[in-house]
């Protein structure tokens, strides 16, 4: 090896860099330095420039264009802005003009950008394994539907949740022509218990708007509203608005969490109580009785106090295994806050718990404040697992002429695969319309590729008075079609409707139902404005006054009293919850979302079973032991992770893993859906499960982003109570040490600007939206589970999570960690080729073509935030995946170090714009990817030299501190101490 370049540029760029001895390295060091200083570019980084022959008028080369659109996930929608360059989407952020999501976009909305360019997408129609055309598919669909209409034989149309008024109208039009059409809308992660309880109580299923920003006291009963909930971005924003304490008069909310399986919401609790999920309804009814007896809160008309007799606080506390004084303290908090309180229940709990929640919110008066029933949306009609089982039983008897499976994958998520197989084989003609050749597609004759949502048109009821619009940000990449467009074309040829395509159908429906009749504004102008803004206000009448059916409450009381009397046995409960990244499995082929650490366990690329310390000791289990989890005769395997804060007798397991198709998804985790009991009213909560270690003692490694959970007495995360905060000043903080460090190196000066960041740990909930936004913005590669296991992950931001206190019931502290852009940076002084330097405006910058990969900088970084490219990850990508790259950010080759840049490309874009317009940069105008994505508003970026900037003001807060100040490294990132608001005995007053 004579040429030092060969160390970095090998014949096989995807291979790992060979080890090199210290002697060999030193002999090549001078040559390496000469190479770095004498080369202006890397020969790996070459490309071909292909100009437009005729440039589209709306595209300005080098200038980003933004399109307002809408992301849907189950029953939830989020307004987004799609950033495009030269006609291709490269980044997604929240749309601040969207009335429902209010500028908040979730990590899965941002991460699904990668799904647009997924090389595993179905690229053209297939019929029985052979390529075909869309004309062939249309003829087959028309022939099938026409024959079914003549034979009066039903057709099964299976979809996901329909929250689009135009989609619903399209299906209704099809039903009018095909009276026997069976529309089965089903979501594998639907809030079945919540819908069932609402229907029983009010006579119709409603989805109320929850106003966490108005709540002084929030009680969560196994509800992960800050984590895996599809509406989490909005909830986080509202919750965090009451957590950031900027002045003494601010009133901080208090979060009580009662749960059995540890969640991100539980990690943010001010008070946390471990309760078995099956007993949560009894706890809620006990609180109702206590509020009525001790705090004079009236019961709703028709319900008598004696009906709550079985739920006296002492026996209920004893049966739950918790201290009665904690429940009294909780009741006192609720009694004090009254209408400024809010009780939430998780979708995994049975309907009885949801009915108890409605009772509590009614007694507290929350239904006139924090529970906005006037803005409630009717829940879409959704089938339960039991309903779907009945339909498949009919199909297995040959009762359907055809099956159309659109945006639904029952072959994967329906628990009884044998019944599904029997059903699908007895349906004469089957069509799968979807993104992938997934499990359901493999069982269907026709596999029809659908547009990704970024290629499609659509509309959605995001709120009772707001309709969102979706528009394509790019033309179809493959030979795909929007499912609605395919159906519209077939229906036109069958003389069912007259529109030529779905866009025409959509505009016609808006002309009839949304456009204000008699408006002086032409419809096309109205439509263009709605498309531009991403939606439109649509004034509608609020729901009729709701009357609670007390019989539903009484039934819940009877069932809960019976459960409460049963003693806690040695059998265990299993809580199934959607994966933080993969959700219900729809994103399982997405590398960004698979490599995103679970916010609680920090596991990636798998779904370990969370066990309590007590259960692990009882079963003689250790981390990574492989266990069998059985529910009756159904068994799955998963590795164990011993989770601090997990309630004894409760196991947590994420859904969405164990897929059978997709190059990324196959072999990742275990499919937990087969454990579900289709007949249960709470399918995601399983009683009486068995856990045992594999007989051969097999173990399975868990790729974890963090394996050390303790701060070991250090104070990198400072946490105070509200009471303690009142005694703090900026120069009098516990553990704060100021050192005047003498140095031979002159102190850096930044006469014009000094870019800095402030992170509010009190507002940050650890949702990881910043991690995905950074990965999307900065072309950060996916490394895979094997590399995560060896500590070679590439994400520039991580969320550190630490436990303190009793490991069986700890408190949790969270801290985003990224390059601190130190003024006296330890990484800069050890780089032999000057590849990492300081910019005139305070940025610790990387010059990639100088870097020769010594990794000295990484060794000398006290924050461990630098990442080294051990591989040439770009060469591993398949087309069209490389289209996701942001052209404003260099794609780094193998052998190069990288880290957070404070989004220098965004800084330069704003500087250039301000220079052209002849003005100064405004405070807040520059948003890094992480600060723009943070739904909590916990990250603030700006010019520290501007005394009026938010960054400068927050840096002077009595909560402000910088990490490792005693080293004299002068970080540019300031943290605001975490503030908690635990309940006190005075709350009883």
Predicted regions and their residues:
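N-terminal export/assembly segments and adjacent metallocofactor-ligating motifs
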Residues: 1-310, 314-315, 321-328, 596-610, ...
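Short, well-ordered beta-strand core segments
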Residues: 218-219, 255, 272, 403, ...
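Active-site phosphate/pyrophosphate-binding segments
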Residues: 271-395, 512-523, 527
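N-terminal leader/propeptide and maturation segments of large enzyme subunits in energy/redox metabolism
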Residues: 289, 296-318, 475-545, 625, ...
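Long, low-complexity segments enriched in small/aliphatic residues
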Residues: 348, 509-601
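Hydrophobic alpha/beta core scaffold segments
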Residues: 398, 412-455, 614, 619
């Amino acid at each position: 090896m004579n040429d030092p370049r060969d160390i970095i540029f090998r014949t096989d760029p995807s291979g790992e860099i060979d080890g090199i001895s210290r002697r060999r390295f030193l002999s090549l060091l001078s040559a390496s330095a000469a190479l770095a200083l004498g080369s202006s570019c890397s020969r790996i980084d070459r490309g071909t420039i292909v100009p437009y022959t005729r440039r589209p008028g709306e595209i300005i080369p080098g200038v980003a264009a933004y399109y307002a659109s809408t992301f849907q996930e189950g029953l939830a929608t989020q307004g987004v802005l799609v950033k495009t360059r030269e006609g291709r989407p490269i980044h997604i952020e929240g749309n601040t003009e969207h009335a429902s999501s209010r500028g908040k976009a979730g990590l899965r909305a941002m991460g699904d950008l990668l799904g647009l360019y997924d090389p595993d997408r179905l690229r053209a129609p297939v019929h029985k394994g052979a390529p075909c055309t869309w004309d062939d598919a249309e003829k087959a669909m028309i022939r099938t539907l026409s024959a079914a209409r003549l034979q009066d034989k039903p057709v099964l149309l299976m979809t996901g949740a329909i929250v689009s008024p135009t989609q619903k109208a399209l299906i209704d039009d099809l039903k009018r022509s095909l009276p026997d059409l069976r529309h089965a809308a089903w979501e594998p992660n639907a809030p079945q218990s919540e819908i069932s309880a609402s229907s029983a109580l009010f006579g119709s299923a409603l989805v109320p708007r929850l106003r966490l920003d108005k709540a002084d006291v929030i009680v969560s009963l196994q509800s992960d509203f800050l984590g895996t909930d599809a509406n989490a971005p909005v909830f986080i924003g509202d919750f965090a608005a009451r957590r950031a304490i900027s002045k003494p008069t601010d009133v901080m909310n208090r979060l009580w969490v009662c749960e059995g399986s540890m969640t991100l919401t539980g990690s943010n609790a001010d008070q946390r109580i471990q309760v078995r999920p099956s007993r949560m309804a009894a706890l809620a009814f006990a609180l109702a009785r206590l509020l009525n007896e001790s705090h004079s809160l009236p019961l709703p008309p028709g319900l008598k106090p004696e009906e709550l007799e079985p739920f006296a606080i002492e026996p209920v506390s004893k049966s739950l295994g918790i201290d009665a004084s904690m429940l009294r303290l909780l009741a006192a908090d609720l009694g004090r806050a009254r209408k400024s309180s809010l009780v939430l229940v998780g979708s995994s709990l049975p309907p009885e718990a949801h009915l108890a929640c409605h009772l509590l919110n009614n007694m507290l008066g929350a239904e006139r404040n924090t529970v906005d029933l006037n803005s409630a949306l009717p829940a879409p009609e959704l089938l339960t697992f039991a309903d779907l089982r009945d339909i498949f039983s009919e199909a297995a008897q040959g009762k359907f002429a055809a099956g159309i499976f659109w945006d639904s994958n029952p072959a994967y998520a329906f628990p009884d695969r044998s019944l599904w197989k029997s059903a699908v084989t007895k349906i004469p003609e089957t069509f799968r319309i979807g993104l992938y050749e997934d499990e359901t597609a493999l069982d269907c004759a026709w596999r029809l590729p659908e547009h990704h949502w970024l290629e499609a048109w659509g509309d959605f009821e995001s709120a009772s008075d707001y309709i969102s619009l979706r528009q394509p940000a790019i033309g179809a990449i493959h030979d795909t079609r929007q499912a609605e467009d395919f159906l519209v074309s077939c229906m036109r040829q069958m003389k069912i409707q007259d529109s030529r395509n779905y866009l025409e159908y959509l505009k016609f429906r808006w002309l009839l139902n949304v456009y204000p009749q008699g408006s002086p504004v032409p419809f096309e102008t109205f439509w263009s404005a709605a498309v531009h803004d991403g939606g439109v206000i649509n004034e509608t009448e609020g729901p009729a006054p709701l009357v609670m059916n007390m019989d539903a409450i009484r039934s819940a009381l009877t069932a809960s009293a019976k459960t409460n009397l049963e003693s806690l046995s040695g059998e265990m409960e299993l809580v199934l919850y959607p994966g933080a990244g993969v959700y219900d499995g729809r994103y399982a082929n997405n590398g960004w979302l698979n490599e995103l650490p679970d916010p609680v366990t920090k596991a990636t690329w798998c779904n370990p079973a969370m066990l309590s310390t007590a259960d692990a000791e009882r079963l003689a289990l250790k981390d990574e032991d492989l266990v069998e989890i059985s529910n009756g005769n159904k068994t799955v395997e998963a590795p164990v992770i011993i989770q601090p804060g997990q309630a004894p007798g409760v196991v947590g397991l994420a859904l969405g893993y164990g897929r059978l198709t997709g190059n990324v998804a196959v072999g990742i985790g275990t499919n937990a859906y087969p454990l579900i009991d289709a007949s249960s009213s709470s399918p995601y909560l399983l009683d009486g499960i068995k856990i045992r270690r594999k007989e051969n003692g097999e173990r399975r490694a868990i790729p974890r982003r963090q394996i050390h959970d303790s701060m070991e007495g250090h104070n990198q995360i400072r946490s105070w109570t509200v009471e303690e905060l009142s005694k703090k000043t900026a120069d009098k903080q516990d553990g704060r040490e100021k050192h005047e460090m003498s140095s031979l190196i002159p102190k850096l000066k930044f006469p014009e600007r000094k870019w800095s960041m402030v992170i509010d740990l009190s507002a940050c909930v650890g949702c990881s939206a910043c991690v995905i936004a950074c990965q999307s913005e900065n072309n950060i590669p996916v490394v895979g589970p094997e590399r995560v296991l060896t500590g070679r992950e590439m994400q520039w931001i991580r969320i550190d999570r630490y436990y303190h206190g009793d490991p069986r019931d700890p408190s949790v502290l969270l801290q985003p960690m990224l390059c601190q852009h130190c003024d006296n940076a330890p990484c800069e002084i050890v780089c032999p080729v000057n590849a990492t330097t300081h910019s005139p405006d305070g940025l610790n910058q990387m010059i990639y073509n100088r870097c020769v990969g010594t990794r000295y900088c990484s060794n000398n970084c006290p924050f461990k935030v630098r990442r080294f490219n051990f591989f040439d990850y770009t060469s591993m990508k398949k087309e069209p995946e490389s289209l996701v790259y942001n052209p404003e950010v260099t794609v780094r080759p193998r052998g190069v170090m990288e880290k957070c840049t404070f989004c220098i490309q965004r800084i330069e874009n704003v500087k250039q714009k301000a220079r052209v317009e002849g003005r100064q940069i405004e405070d807040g105008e520059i948003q890094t990817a992480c600060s723009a994505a943070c739904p909590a508003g916990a990250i603030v970026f700006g010019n520290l030299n501007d005394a009026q900037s938010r960054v400068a003001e927050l840096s002077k807060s009595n909560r402000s501190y910088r990490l490792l100040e005693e080293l004299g490294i002068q970080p540019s990132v300031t943290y605001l101490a975490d503030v908690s608001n635990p309940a006190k005995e005075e709350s009883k007053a």
